[in-house]
């Protein structure tokens, strides 16, 4: 399949009525100035979200975006950040929000590495991951007894390790399909789909800057 063809699909549901109400409030609230702190995971923030950040900056020049790379919702629940953008199917019940799109994942390896192990009749090595609970769980399910000779706690680091022939690992398809050095070792399985959630604290649901981001992402 073409690069990125299966990686992100529109969500099948929407909160159109709620969003319409929020948009009305947004038009009445002129306080679209100040700082907006967004916590987002590294691989999403530096790739697919960057275009959205750039267009938001142009649409709302008086709002200063502060993007923090983080995989934890703790900073949001403690009010250190205004919005968190997460890949998950089970967002914490302390926060509210909605899933915007579905992100597929597959197992990837370097093209030359996979060719080499196939010629030798060997099984590819698995890269140990500790970047998030779902990637860690999926890896364990596929190679529970496997000894990992390389371990990573960051998806971008895992991507680099795959490129260097250190083994195979799960990656979001928007990352793996876009890299010509990589090849799918397996096709995406729907059970590994994750939602891209925009989360915020309940007290901030009517804040003008938060509403502006929600409306902008929903376009």
Predicted regions and their residues:
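Alpha-helical "hinge/linker" immediately C-terminal to small N-terminal DNA-binding modules
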Residues: 1-27
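Short loop or secondary-structure boundary microenvironments that flank
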Residues: 11, 42, 175, 200-203
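All-alpha effector-binding/dimerization core of bacterial HTH-type transcriptional repressors
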Residues: 31, 47-52, 104, 119-123
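Central regulatory/effector-binding core of bacterial HTH transcription factors
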Residues: 33-92
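Short, well-ordered beta-strand segments
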Residues: 37-39, 84, 127, 169, ...
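C-terminal regulatory
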Residues: 78, 90-197
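A late-sequence structural motif
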Residues: 188-219
